[in-house]
């Protein structure tokens, strides 16, 4: 059908763009692992009393936000994200994560679970921009929420 053909075209186009991006700036461990690793780099900053209180708080907030993609991917696979995240963080090996497709722990790069560096950086940069805008705004207009009653 036309819809399936358009969807297939979009997937191929996305793949081509991802490869181009990877060729430009390289790749990082996928599955949220690269962002999870960066969240760990912020822990010393958030605990260091030499930094102002606001700086430490911002580091904690950003670290928590960087953990979210990894946790969401694991949760979407129907797995306890806290348990998996603890195991990955305890291992402390660069690129080590959990492959939800094979349900195995290991090196994400070797398993082919990758993200283009440029895409990861752009997503993070855009998220920080949106968060900064929200935090510096007095009011925000969003879509109305609908609540379902049980």
Specify the residue positions occupied by each region the protein language model found.
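Extended, low-charge hydrophobic alpha-helical regions
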Residues: 1-150
């Amino acid at each position: 059908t036309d819809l399936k053909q358009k969807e297939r075209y979009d997937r191929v186009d996305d793949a081509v763009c991802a490869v181009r991006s990877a060729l430009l700036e390289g790749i990082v461990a996928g599955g949220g692992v690269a962002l999870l690793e960066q969240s760990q780099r912020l822990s010393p900053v958030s605990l260091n009393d030499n930094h102002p209180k606001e700086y430490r708080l911002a580091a904690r907030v950003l670290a928590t936000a960087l953990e979210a993609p990894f946790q969401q991917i694991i949760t979407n696979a129907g797995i306890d994200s806290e348990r998996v995240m603890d195991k990955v963080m305890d291992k402390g090996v660069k690129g080590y994560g959990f492959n939800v497709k094979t349900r195995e722990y290991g090196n994400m790069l070797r398993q082919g679970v990758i993200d283009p560096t440029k895409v990861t950086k752009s997503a993070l940069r855009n998220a920080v921009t949106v968060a900064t805008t929200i935090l510096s705004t007095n009011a925000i207009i969003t879509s109305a929420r609908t609540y379902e009653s049980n």
